[in-house]
Amino acid sequence: MVVMLRYVWPLLLCSPCLLIQIPDEYKGHHVLEPPVITEQSPRRLVVFPTDDISLKCEARGRPQVEFRWTKDGIHFKPKEELGVVVHEAPYSGSFTIEGNNSFAQRFQGIYRCYASNKLGTAMSHEIQLVAEGAPKWPKETVKPVEVEEGESVVLPCNPPPSAAPPRIYWMNSKIFDIKQDERVSMGQNGDLYFANVLTSDNHSDYICNAHFPGTRTIIQKEPIDLRVKPTNSMIDRKPRLLFPTNSSSRLVALQGQSLILECIAEGFPTPTIKWLHPSDPMPTDRVIYQNHNKTLQLLNVGEEDDGEYTCLAENSLGSARHAYYVTVEAAPYWLQKPQSHLYGPGETARLDCQVQGRPQPEITWRINGMSMETVNKDQKYRIEQGSLILSNVQPTDTMVTQCEARNQHGLLLANAYIYVVQLPARILTKDNQTYMAVEGSTAYLLCKAFGAPVPSVQWLDEEGTTVLQDERFFPYANGTLSIRDLQANDTGRYFCQAANDQNNVTILANLQVKEATQITQGPRSAIEKKGARVTFTCQASFDPSLQASITWRGDGRDLQERGDSDKYFIEDGKLVIQSLDYSDQGNYSCVASTELDEVESRAQLLVVGSPGPVPHLELSDRHLLKQSQVHLSWSPAEDHNSPIEKYDIEFEDKEMAPEKWFSLGKVPGNQTSTTLKLSPYVHYTFRVTAINKYGPGEPSPVSESVVTPEAAPEKNPVDVRGEGNETNNMVITWKPLRWMDWNAPQIQYRVQWRPQGKQETWRKQTVSDPFLVVSNTSTFVPYEIKVQAVNNQGKGPEPQVTIGYSGEDYPQVSPELEDITIFNSSTVLVRWRPVDLAQVKGHLKGYNVTYWWKGSQRKHSKRHIHKSHIVVPANTTSAILSGLRPYSSYHVEVQAFNGRGLGPASEWTFSTPEGVPGHPEALHLECQSDTSLLLHWQPPLSHNGVLTGYLLSYHPVEGESKEQLFFNLSDPELRTHNLTNLNPDLQYRFQLQATTQQGGPGEAIVREGGTMALFGKPDFGNISATAGENYSVVSWVPRKGQCNFRFHILFKALPEGKVSPDHQPQPQYVSYNQSSYTQWNLQPDTKYEIHLIKEKVLLHHLDVKTNGTGPVRVSTTGSFASEGWFIAFVSAIILLLLILLILCFIKRSKGGKYSVKDKEDTQVDSEARPMKDETFGEYRSLESDNEEKAFGSSQPSLNGDIKPLGSDDSLADYGGSVDVQFNEDGSFIGQYSGKKEKEAAGGNDSSGATSPINPAVALE
């Protein structure tokens, strides 16, 4: 059996129980036990004639206990009494007096039970039996009570005496309760008190009812007739106490019980009662006021409640008082109750009996129910300070003692035995137990021994020597051995030996010391924002032989993943907390535990964020509202772990701008109040928002609203302007005041104006709108203008004078051009002379320069004209036009403009010189042989002058020699050039540039490439084969730069012999650049092996299997193609195609023809957008945005996406423009025909078939 040591320590606390009784584990010995009373009747029993009376007395002991009773100190034998039934149950001496014989009165008295066996006698406490008869009210004659109105009266009750006080109720003959209040009330004695009587109290049936719960009966007193004599003059009188009647009294209160004090007063008007405790404050938590304050009940009386309690009765004429002097006393109570003990021979027995009470109780000792004087003849017992002491006890000294304490308030009794026994030593802990603990902890090896005398216990190691030589080993009195600071070498066997004068016994304990659990990486404290997530990591090392786990706690609570929430994610020693809130902050612990130990590592999480709402907004100093001020205060907001930097104070006017908040300012974060400067006539509702480094928090709840008084405006409108929108008027405008500056419910504006420089009378008008139109003015005349705010409280401050102007007219003068300076082929400077301001008819805003391209110098454009604009300020008389096309004609116009619009234009025409041409288009490399390449290209899109030819250069990309070779090609119409004597092992970089008469070479186009030998064996990229029922398609991607060649393709049916030789496909010649080949007339559902062969060298092979899913090539013999309907159908299609071709030819003829070299003259700006005449912006030129764009849909993109001819294009794309023949090795044996080449070279104006030297159409 393995004992987990961390659960052992609490067991040690129970070790004192060995002194109280023999352990249950001590088996095999018939141990005797002195009598112990287990149940007895209460100290006082009140019974009635019909009740059964049970007197209980039960006790345990070995041998069997015998019982006897005394009544009033005389031996009482229940079995011999008539009407008494004795309980025959084991361990019981109880008996019952049957109530149906009305014997209760005869059995009144004080009883005591004695339980005895040969070891001693136990004694019960005294049981007082009180028998009562049926309660009866004595016969009496009740006389009417006569009293004058306003006087006091007491109606007596005087119920029959009883051991159990009855409950009193006052009712009338109709069984209705007598209403009680401050004037009429019942005292604790049952009497009914009237502080003063009224005529309404005149009744003849005041009946006192007494309820006796013990007999379950209610008896009535004879009705009392209360006669009230009316009077016309009720005399006021000061209070007088009806109970108690004297000025003071003394009471004794028992500690722990309740104290009831009562004061009932009479007087007119009816007095009120209050209670005073002069020495100390009244203990309000234990005081109950009842009966309209006439009764004070003090609960759980203690010694501190000693002292004076005064009741004070008051009305308008005076007062009366009574002083209760309360003394707190106590019945006896235990400080230390004597306990039963087991002793061995020769030991000293001591029984302590410490009792307290007020007055101090008297303590007496009994032995086996007999007084000390009777049994202590040899003076063996002695009593010291209430304790009973016996020295050198022997088995014959076994006894049961009684300690009894008594004062006038009660008595206490306790039985305790001294049991002197002789028992052999026995170890109650199981033998050969295994204990496990971890290094560094404390192990507890148990050895619970029992015997009489108490055995001595010692621990030995495997060699039989005591273990106490090591200071880490410590034995406890209960036999347990503790080993602190455990080490791995403490593992082993230990022996516990217990011995007394009768025998000795030994048990074995096995100790295993394991590695202690350690946290190698604990969680680290973190500060995270609200809404973020945090990850805590924990790693630990464990003893490999123990089951281990890592768990997490948050503020001491175990954390677990919940299926209905993704708040926590726990896995592999990680704790992830999602969607952090402020409630998540706290201490988080990683707990690494085994069944033996656990270690914990803590980290603190702080959740930071914007502050919480500001609480407790309060307005004060409202008298300052007359000065448009108020004091606002608040309590600090929750800072959420980031100091509050400032508070933002905002207001809302629910009348003028509901749900819109305006800032009144900010105060430092350590300030929680401020006096606000307010505007007149605003309905203010305030709120405050706290701000820290993470931003503003939630706004506070809104404050109550306040309204400031009205006042005259303190501001005038700003941004006053005078401008005409017609030539004969002036529109005066201004920025209206915000409503919070009105200072009143409404606002108006007093507008004044007069011509500038003339001391004329101000013309004025008051308006509500933020504008005024002044009509019938002269064109562009200056005016002095003033605008003043006005409300029902007065005018605003004196306004400032603003100069405005009446309406403008169009300028009447055009700028005179001075000259045009040409900087280069794309930039010119245009200059003009300033215009006469008197002719502008308004404010000169600037000049508008308009220019547009008319065409190249060789040919003017007939296309849509796009105009570009530049706007320059009024103080500038020149403009730079940039981004122009070289070798082109331009038209320029300059106009002055004012607020009304543009004036007349000055015109000029100029031309730009030739410039550098653009780069040639579409440079392609075509392999001719392993040492030669054919280059072909297209001319530049932008000639920028007259082309004079091309400059071609190239050099190897790698290798030792990088000599640059140049070819000056002087024919501008040239489109191809053949290069020979190239090294087949090198890669070359080719560069081609165009030239003009005045510039060049221009921008270059660059390509890299080489001949076939550079790339070695041909590459069939992404080759694949697909099949139908009787055909197969082989497809591949020709490699870029690879020379074209021919090869055989052979389909061979598998297995051999499946297909007859007549149906075997014959080898076919295929060109590399054609990218695919289709083989027909294959057999369905047959596997074929495909071989690609060149000069008996296998280039590639693959397999394919035919099926029935594809189209079937049909033989012409007997097919539907010979049917008449099919021939007619094909003829109709051909006819339709001819008609379409004719229509297309007609349409192209109407569109005109143009050569490639003139394309730059006919380009159209597809994105051109004409500028509105009335729109003038910053300096800009749309020319540069659009001049260099391609033709749109008719020209290729210039972004490099065009594939070079001869790379991915197959020879089939060239149509009939080239005659090509191949030898067996794939080399060319023919040349381009002279006719085709001539047509291609001179076909720039046509859109005929594409050829290798005329790719214009192929680029589309």
Swiss-Prot record:
<feature type="disulfide bond">
    <location>
        <begin position="157"/>
        <end position="208"/>
    </location>
</feature>
<feature type="glycosylation site" description="N-linked (GlcNAc...) asparagine">
    <location>
        <position position="293"/>
    </location>
</feature>
<dbReference type="Pfam" id="PF13882">
    <property type="entry name" value="Bravo_FIGEY"/>
</dbReference>
<dbReference type="InterPro" id="IPR036179">
    <property type="entry name" value="Ig-like_dom_sf"/>
</dbReference>
<dbReference type="Pfam" id="PF07679">
    <property type="entry name" value="I-set"/>
</dbReference>
<feature type="domain" description="Ig-like C2-type 3">
    <location>
        <begin position="239"/>
        <end position="327"/>
    </location>
</feature>
<dbReference type="GO" id="GO:0033631">
    <property type="term" value="P:cell-cell adhesion mediated by integrin"/>
</dbReference>
<keyword id="KW-0597">Phosphoprotein</keyword>
<feature type="compositionally biased region" description="Basic and acidic residues">
    <location>
        <begin position="712"/>
        <end position="724"/>
    </location>
</feature>
<feature type="modified residue" description="Phosphoserine">
    <location>
        <position position="1197"/>
    </location>
</feature>
<comment type="function">
    <text>Neural cell adhesion molecule involved in the dynamics of cell adhesion and in the generation of transmembrane signals at tyrosine kinase receptors. During brain development, critical in multiple processes, including neuronal migration, axonal growth and fasciculation, and synaptogenesis. In the mature brain, plays a role in the dynamics of neuronal structure and function, including synaptic plasticity.</text>
</comment>
<feature type="topological domain" description="Cytoplasmic">
    <location>
        <begin position="1147"/>
        <end position="1260"/>
    </location>
</feature>
<keyword id="KW-1015">Disulfide bond</keyword>
<feature type="glycosylation site" description="N-linked (GlcNAc...) asparagine">
    <location>
        <position position="875"/>
    </location>
</feature>
<feature type="disulfide bond">
    <location>
        <begin position="353"/>
        <end position="403"/>
    </location>
</feature>
<dbReference type="InterPro" id="IPR026966">
    <property type="entry name" value="Neurofascin/L1/NrCAM_C"/>
</dbReference>
<keyword id="KW-0732">Signal</keyword>
<feature type="domain" description="Ig-like C2-type 5">
    <location>
        <begin position="424"/>
        <end position="506"/>
    </location>
</feature>
<feature type="glycosylation site" description="N-linked (GlcNAc...) asparagine">
    <location>
        <position position="670"/>
    </location>
</feature>
<feature type="glycosylation site" description="N-linked (GlcNAc...) asparagine">
    <location>
        <position position="432"/>
    </location>
</feature>
<feature type="disulfide bond">
    <location>
        <begin position="263"/>
        <end position="311"/>
    </location>
</feature>
<feature type="glycosylation site" description="N-linked (GlcNAc...) asparagine">
    <location>
        <position position="1030"/>
    </location>
</feature>
<feature type="glycosylation site" description="N-linked (GlcNAc...) asparagine">
    <location>
        <position position="776"/>
    </location>
</feature>
<dbReference type="GO" id="GO:0098982">
    <property type="term" value="C:GABA-ergic synapse"/>
</dbReference>
<dbReference type="GO" id="GO:0042734">
    <property type="term" value="C:presynaptic membrane"/>
</dbReference>
<feature type="region of interest" description="Disordered">
    <location>
        <begin position="697"/>
        <end position="724"/>
    </location>
</feature>
<keyword id="KW-0966">Cell projection</keyword>
<feature type="glycosylation site" description="N-linked (GlcNAc...) asparagine">
    <location>
        <position position="504"/>
    </location>
</feature>
<feature type="glycosylation site" description="N-linked (GlcNAc...) asparagine">
    <location>
        <position position="1107"/>
    </location>
</feature>
<dbReference type="GO" id="GO:0098685">
    <property type="term" value="C:Schaffer collateral - CA1 synapse"/>
</dbReference>
<keyword id="KW-0472">Membrane</keyword>
<feature type="glycosylation site" description="N-linked (GlcNAc...) asparagine">
    <location>
        <position position="978"/>
    </location>
</feature>
<feature type="disulfide bond">
    <location>
        <begin position="538"/>
        <end position="590"/>
    </location>
</feature>
<feature type="short sequence motif" description="Cell attachment site">
    <location>
        <begin position="562"/>
        <end position="564"/>
    </location>
</feature>
<dbReference type="GO" id="GO:0005178">
    <property type="term" value="F:integrin binding"/>
</dbReference>
<feature type="signal peptide">
    <location>
        <begin position="1"/>
        <end position="19"/>
    </location>
</feature>
<dbReference type="GO" id="GO:0022409">
    <property type="term" value="P:positive regulation of cell-cell adhesion"/>
</dbReference>
<dbReference type="GO" id="GO:0045773">
    <property type="term" value="P:positive regulation of axon extension"/>
</dbReference>
<dbReference type="GO" id="GO:0050850">
    <property type="term" value="P:positive regulation of calcium-mediated signaling"/>
</dbReference>
<dbReference type="InterPro" id="IPR003961">
    <property type="entry name" value="FN3_dom"/>
</dbReference>
<feature type="glycosylation site" description="N-linked (GlcNAc...) asparagine">
    <location>
        <position position="848"/>
    </location>
</feature>
<dbReference type="GO" id="GO:0007157">
    <property type="term" value="P:heterophilic cell-cell adhesion via plasma membrane cell adhesion molecules"/>
</dbReference>
